[in-house]
Amino acid sequence: MRDAGEGKQKHGQQEHIETLPLFSTTDKNGRMTMLRPGRRVGRAAPLIPWLITAAALWALTGSVPFGALLGMAPTPAINMLLGHPVTVGVAVLLLFVAIVMTGAVYSLSMEQFGQTRVAGLFSTLSVTGGLAAVAGVLLLWTLTSNPSRPFDLEAIATSPTIPLELGAVVGASFALWAAIALLRLPGSIAHARRRQADIERLRVEGSSYTGALTAVNFTNSWLFNLPIFTVEVNYIVDGAPRVVPAHMRTSDDRVPVVGSRMIVLTDDRGTTHVELDLASGAAFEPDVGKYAPSDG
């Protein structure tokens, strides 16, 4: 077995060590929530500037395909400008910057709220919101600069060239996607904050017990290549044994073995949180490829 404290970890691996494995007695998959020791309950305000910046980059990047390829340039001169090789080259560079910025939005969202569902919604909103915005601006600009031009969706099928209407439909699709993400975001943030508040409260006010991992069952499913398990944790309260079922998400090289020491936090409200006791020298499954996702 591999000892958790064996060797020194590189700085880039520290976050991986602190957050995995992740346990939840109430949620599973993307709704599982973490709160690192010493962190406060997450806030959305610090993410807004990053979200707006990422969306703006996607809008700038999307102006080229929407304007030059999807017929949404308001004038022939702007169409030529957007289709110029230099403009296309700049758009490609902006695309890479936008991808990096979107990754930063995801990482910062995870840092704030500790939940992949919330992080995914923030990053999705940055992409779809930016593309929907530029499509809307170009569509409005084109229609106002040429009010006599009819807007007919049938042109998508009948026009010999790529019509404005096709770009409008693509833009509307991104707008719908962005609206769905935006509508789901407040509830997801509230859920993550409640879970983090529970964890924070249990660490300060809850009763702490030493437990043991007595069952680890692989569900044969993964979330972003991270295997998902159902587990059972046994602990003793006033001489009586108790069992806590939980979901676990981890990496294939950090699957704790049966018998690993656990920390169980509970309160009078019936809220329970479990964590792996890394300080005790937890042992992990030695076959690191056992739970890796198959290529097929």
Where are the language model's segments positioned?
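Oxidizing extracytosolic/periplasmic lumen-facing domains
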Residues: 2-296
